[in-house]
Design a protein with these regions (language model features):
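N-terminal Sec signal peptide cleavage junction
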Residues: 18-19
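N-terminal catalytic cores of secreted or lumenal carbohydrate-active enzymes
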Residues: 26-174
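Structural preference for beta-strand elements that scaffold enzyme active sites
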Residues: 37-42, 72-80, 139-145, 195-201, ...
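Well-ordered, non-membrane alpha-helical segments in soluble/globular domains
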Residues: 52-65, 97-131, 162-186, 210-219, ...
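Aromatic-lined carbohydrate-recognition surfaces of secreted/lumenal glycan-active proteins
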Residues: 138-153, 163-180, 197-207, 218-239, ...
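Extracellular glycoside hydrolase catalytic/binding regions
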Residues: 179, 218, 224-268, 301-302
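Substrate-binding cleft of secreted/luminal carbohydrate-active enzymes
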Residues: 249-263, 267-361
Length: 361
């Protein structure tokens, strides 16, 4: 997530027209079968991360317990992603001096499926919630990050006895295909009952080094039955070109939360209008600065996102992604500060209501 630099009203659900799936008359993208309604970003894979996505951390994103003790389904999509390994190497351009090699790509693919963490923890949590409220209407979806083969890299490693050179687009594409195959192989070997692998997320948030390879990479994963996801940051190179780049699903990052000086009142409506014009979905963003104890307290900005998305018609009709910093949904839930707990309840109820639009309990 590049740092720089919701209340329901009945609104016509076709205000936004996003072309990622065929829809029946009267459907909105939020209710369209095969779409992820609410996808939470779960950063994991670098040693610098404090969150391990254990059972309790995952449960806060799987289900919400209301004031009456009743459970409700929360997020229906889980995006596991990482930008760097925390040891000086990066999975995308610009984050570290050195790019990750094949060995780091392998470590990343494997870490999302270890026992008791990430996908395995989600599987356990969903089992527990199912035992109380039954099966969700929509099987929970997993999206896994796809590292960027960074141009100029010579030390990535070998495939089929050949040293790959990332000045060569064919070698970059082959590395991506290998990683896709590896993730699919590991995911299938785990035999999850509650999770489906929906597709892969292109970790480069700008198109600068991507234009010459993403068509072929996307075609390959689609040939295997998976979707290609992208979440470019606001103003990035190519951030409105997702259809031309052949991504299947694209969310626009507003980046409103991250400015040191709060943007004016027309900022978020402008982002919403851009997303509408380009047929993109939208992302909600907040991090540890939504905690009341943070000296740079910004919880009001989370409210601004939801207000803007409600006013433009996105809140009850459009799939959303959620950038939550390290593990902010759980942090708000377990905080000793009532103001944080209230913010968690308010936020969780918005997600629950959106899931209820999709037919969930």
């Amino acid at each position: 997530m590049k740092k720089i630099l919701l209340i329901f009203l009945i609104i016509p659900v076709l205000i936004f027209s996003c072309g990622t799936s065929d829809r029946r008359p009267g459907d909105s993208p939020l209710t369209t079968e095969g779409n992820i309604g609410d996808m939470v970003l779960m950063y994991y894979g670098g040693v610098h991360r404090k969150t391990t996505w254990n059972h309790d951390q995952c449960m806060s994103s799987v289900a919400y317990e209301d004031a009456h003790g009743k459970l409700h389904w929360m997020f229906d999509g889980f995006l596991f992603l990482e930008f760097k390994n925390g040891k000086g190497r990066a999975y995308a351009s610009y984050y570290e001096p050195l790019p990750c090699r094949k060995v780091e790509w392998e470590e990343l693919a494997q870490c999302y499926f270890v026992d008791g963490r990430a996908c395995s923890a989600l599987e356990e949590c969903i089992d527990e919630v199912k035992a109380q409220i039954g099966e969700p209407k929509h099987k929970r979806q997993v999206v896994v990050t796809l590292p960027e083969p960074i141009p100029g890299q010579k030390d990535w490693g070998q495939l089929n006895g050949k040293d790959l050179d990332f000045d060569n687009d064919e070698d970059r594409i082959e590395a991506c295909k290998w990683y896709i195959d590896e993730v699919i192989r590991i995911f299938k070997s785990r035999n999850y009952k509650n999770l489906e692998l929906a597709g892969f997320y292109w970790v480069a948030e700008e198109a600068t080094h991507s234009r010459t390879i993403v068509h072929q990479v996307g075609d390959y994963m689609r040939s295997l039955g998976y979707k290609f996801y992208w979440i470019p940051y606001w103003g990035s190179d190519g951030h409105g070109e997702w259809k031309e780049l052949k991504f299947d699903v694209a969310y626009q990052q507003p980046n409103y939360f991250f400015y040191q000086q709060k943007p004016d009142s027309v900022y978020l409506p402008k982002v919403c209008e851009f997303a509408k014009e380009r047929g993109m979905y939208l992302e909600v963003e907040f991090d540890e600065r939504a905690l009341r104890s943070n000296p740079d307290y910004r919880a009001d900005r989370l409210h601004d996102y939801m207000d803007a998305f409600q006013k433009c018609g996105a809140l009850d009709s459009l799939p959303l992604a959620y950038y939550i910093g390290d593990c902010m949904v759980n942090d708000l839930k377990v905080s000793s500060c009532k103001e944080d707990n209230d913010l968690y309840d308010w936020f969780a109820n918005i997600v629950v209501k959106r899931q209820q639009i999709r037919g969930e309990k």
